[in-house]
Amino acid sequence: MKNQWKTSDFDYNLPVELIAQRPLADRSGSRLLYIDRSRRTVSHRQFNGFVEQVKPNDLVVLNDTKVIPAGLFGHKQTGGKVECLVERILSKDRFLAHIRASKAPKLGSQIIIADNFKIIIEGRYNDLFECVLHSSASILDLLYQHGRIPLPPYIQREPDKDDQARYQTIFAERAGAVAAPTAGLHFNEETFDALRKKGAAITYVTLHVGAGTFQPVRADSLADHRMHHEWMEVSKAVCDAIAKCRKNNGRVIAVGTTVMRCLETATKNGECRPYAGETDLFIYPGFQFKCVDALLTNFHLPKSTLLMLVCAFGGYELVMEAYQKAVENRYRFFSYGDAMLIS
């Protein structure tokens, strides 16, 4: 194992036409690349092959965050255009946001949305602005009236009505994410029925995915990278389900890198403990996993923290080999793309 990992170690060549621009007609119609760590093999399947790999007493853990229409367009008092991406809702009228304008807004300046809603800039924290909405409506009301789904930057088109449904898991409950936990997008009701018939248990954590998930790693060395913060919650019910799974010799299966980060954040000294708060856990090769036994995930961007996490779990050489095979076999990549299972 290398002592000094570099961002460039996680680069790979991806033809642009393999980046999925739209979802498949059938949520569960994706392909599945399966990595067996013990045998060091890579095989090609359909997504229903995921259920085939689940065993009785396994615990499938999903992220129930709900994507909000976090993109707002407005203007300054001077008339200049402003684009606002809500990163985190702090209260009914207070939130943190990324703001794009011809000039960075000053503290105390105003942004007008839809001619009726006034937002005042009250603070700045690195790339984020703290904003207050002056209205009888809440920020969520404003977003659901005038916001739009913030598709990832690699989807080169405007969001449409299909995205409102398809860039959302069918089990989304808790509003607050600006990006979907994409491994969960493959699940439909038939998937859940099949899991229950296999004798698997199902439970949910929450991690509100932030825009930082798309930010590039700017440091050359991973040791110098500062991970973005995201809000998460692992309940006592989840911890109890994990304890029961262990008692019955089952496996904990994380559906997505967000679930992985939740569970590994909440596990201390071999025990999952209830936790609600921030996580900036950065998982890369050399990390000692304490909770998760199998991971279902999508394919991730070159040099991204998500790919680094997958390499940490699946083994660097095996995962990078699998990515090369995925490219050769024309898998669909990123949010609307195909899936990978590592066990």
Swiss-Prot record:
Protein localization: Cytoplasm
Reactions catalysed, as given in the entry: 7-aminomethyl-7-carbaguanosine(34) in tRNA + S-adenosyl-L-methionine = epoxyqueuosine(34) in tRNA + adenine + L-methionine + 2 H(+)
Broadest EC class assigned to this enzyme: transferase
InterPro entries assigned to the protein according to its UniProt record, in alphabetical order: QueA, QueA_dom1, QueA_dom2, QueA_sf
Ranges annotated as spanning the membrane: none
SUPFAM superfamilies linked: QueA-like
Any one Pfam family match given in the protein's UniProt record, by short name: Queuosine_synth
Cellular compartments per GO CC: cytoplasm
Top-level taxonomic group: Bacteria
Keywords in alphabetical order: Cytoplasm, Queuosine biosynthesis, S-adenosyl-L-methionine, Transferase
Keyword Cytoplasm carried by entry: yes
Pathway assigned to this chain's UniProt record: tRNA modification; tRNA-queuosine biosynthesis
EC number: 2.4.99.17
Single GO biological process annotation from the record: tRNA wobble guanine modification
GO MF: S-adenosylmethionine:tRNA ribosyltransferase-isomerase activity
S-adenosyl-L-methionine found in the keyword field: yes
Subunit: Monomer.
Physiological role: Transfers and isomerizes the ribose moiety from AdoMet to the 7-aminomethyl group of 7-deazaguanine (preQ1-tRNA) to give epoxyqueuosine (oQ-tRNA).
Family: Belongs to the QueA family.
Cross-referenced PANTHER family: S-ADENOSYLMETHIONINE:TRNA RIBOSYLTRANSFERASE-ISOMERASE
Protein's name according to its UniProt entry: S-adenosylmethionine:tRNA ribosyltransferase-isomerase
Source organism (scientific name): Coxiella burnetii (strain CbuG_Q212) (Coxiella burnetii (strain Q212))
